[in-house]
Structure formats: C-alpha cells, structure tokens
Amino acid sequence: MERTFIMIKPDGVQRQLIGEIVGRFEKKGFKLVAMKVMTVSQELAEKHYEALNDKPFFSGLVNFICSSPVVAMVWEGNSIVSTSRQMIGATDPHAAAPGTIRGDYGVSVGRNIIHGSDAIETAKREISLWFKDEEVNEWDATLNPWLYE
C-alpha cells in the first residue's frame, strides 16, 4: 500500500482547518497511520525544503513553516500520492480548482494551507525526515474490503 506525507501548514492550523482537511482524506477512504502537532525547527524546515534552497523565497518559507505549529501526517492508500495531489490542488490557490483544498481555503501562494509529497520517492524521504519508524502505525482498517478489490 502506498504512503504519502501531508502537512497542514501554520495558516491551516491557525484557521482551524485541521478537522476539515483530515475529514477529506478519511472520506476518500485513506488511512491515517501517523499524526503529530509540532512546532518545526529551522533545521527540519531547511532539510524538508532543501530542493528550494536556491530560490529567493526560501528563507521566507522556512520562517513561515517555523512560525506556528503544523500538523504532520502519514496517510496510506492506493495511488495516494497522485490522488492526494489532486485533492490538494495547484500550488497557487488562485489557479486551484474549486473543490480542492487550496481552491477552497488557500489565500496566496505563500499561504496555501497544505503540503503533500509530489512523488513516491519524495514521500518516502519526507516520511523518514518527519517520523521515526515506530511512530508510523500498521493497522487493518475494517473498511478495506469495501474499498479495495
């Protein structure tokens, strides 16, 4: 079963959208296997966004992610990386389709509510960066037979 890393950013936490976002993933039939509310250290933020460290917005992004708690999560399900990206919507909320998380709640590129891994390999890297192995739970959801053939 595929896994992905999802983070509700400080703006999503401050706007009290945690339940709404978690609910969307649950209603889609995905399984939450790890979750924690945390204030991100600068070191972790820089590691997480290291692919963007040459961009002019890098320091502002790191400062923003460290400014208030985030909700870090690991979700599991068939094709979850690609499906969750569709659920999240375009990076720029103004370009995100209505019905997506960013389309419904995002305000600007810098305040776009949520992060989701963009590829399976990225998800593996991000999960290992944010969670210890023992923090990710293995459990059988009783609804699996109703979702998967």
Swiss-Prot record:
GO molecular function, one term: ATP binding
A Pfam family: NDK
Family: Belongs to the NDK family.
Source organism (scientific name): Synechocystis sp. (strain ATCC 27184 / PCC 6803 / Kazusa)
CDD domains (UniProt xref): NDPk_I
Function, in words: Major role in the synthesis of nucleoside triphosphates other than ATP. The ATP gamma phosphate is transferred to the NDP beta phosphate via a ping-pong mechanism, using a phosphorylated active-site intermediate.
The protein's name in its UniProt record: Nucleoside diphosphate kinase
Residues at which ATP binds: 9, 57, 85, 91, 102, 112
UniProt cofactor(s): Mg(2+)
Reactions catalysed according to its record: a 2'-deoxyribonucleoside 5'-diphosphate + ATP = a 2'-deoxyribonucleoside 5'-triphosphate + ADP; a ribonucleoside 5'-diphosphate + ATP = a ribonucleoside 5'-triphosphate + ADP
A Gene Ontology term for the protein's cellular component: cytoplasm
Entry keyword set: ATP-binding, Cytoplasm, Kinase, Magnesium, Metal-binding, Nucleotide metabolism, Nucleotide-binding, Phosphoprotein, Transferase
SMART domains named among the record's database cross-references: NDK
Source taxon at top rank: Bacteria
Active site: 115
